Design a protein with these regions (language model features):
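Short, well-ordered alpha-helices that flank and scaffold nucleotide-derived cofactor binding pockets
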Residues: 23-27, 58, 98, 154
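N-terminal beta1-alpha1 ligand-phosphate binding loop
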Residues: 4-29, 33-39
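Short, surface-exposed acidic-centric catalytic microdomains
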Residues: 29-92
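Short, glycine/charged-enriched secondary-structure capping and boundary segments
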Residues: 20-22, 47-50, 124-128
Length: 161
């Protein structure tokens, strides 16, 4: 059975830390599915979905040379039109599973989590986190590069002025 790592992130902007997460996932799974957030559950303000998708494509090409087992998905952008609520990880995983079953294919999905979200106080904030553990499982990755999106956004904003 195909094992797919589901790596959801704001990707606002995508950076080398995200690429390192992908590198950590690849030896453990058959595919890595990158899913930019369309409506973040914790209310993050983000650049347009289209711009973030474009930036992810560029950094994938520049750093990882677009391997075939890395798939960039716009599923959250589709899902946001069916609800006024944030797109939760559990909702996303169930949607991916239902789509797979409707096509008659089987895959196991693992939610990618870094050390920050693996902390109990953060993980317990995830909608239906226990069901995610039981139905899908988690693929834990390390933060080997200290790169944060906030300073990058500020630097981009400063360069535009």
């Amino acid at each position: 059975m195909t094992v797919i790592a589901v790596f959801g992130s704001a990707f606002n902007p995508p950076h080398l830390g995200h690429m390192d997460v992908i590198r950590q996932c690849l030896p453990q799974v058959d595919q890595v599915l990158l899913i930019p957030s369309a409506r973040h559950p914790f209310g993050k303000k983000m650049a347009s979905f289209e711009l973030r998708l474009k930036m992810v494509r560029i950094i994938l090409q520049e750093t990882l040379n677009n391997p075939e087992n890395i798939i960039l998905s716009s599923i959250e952008n589709t899902l946001k039109h069916s609800t006024n609520h944030p797109i939760y990880s559990h909702t996303l995983l169930c949607s991916l599973l239902a789509d797979n079953l409707s096509r008659g294919t089987q895959a196991e999905y693992r939610l990618v989590l870094g050390p920050d979200n693996l902390k109990r106080q953060n993980w317990s904030r995830f909608f239906r986190f226990r069901e995610i553990d039981q139905q899908f499982g988690v693929l834990a990755v390390n933060q080997r590069l200290s790169v944060r999106s906030s300073p990058l956004r500020q630097q981009l904003q400063d360069n535009q002025q």
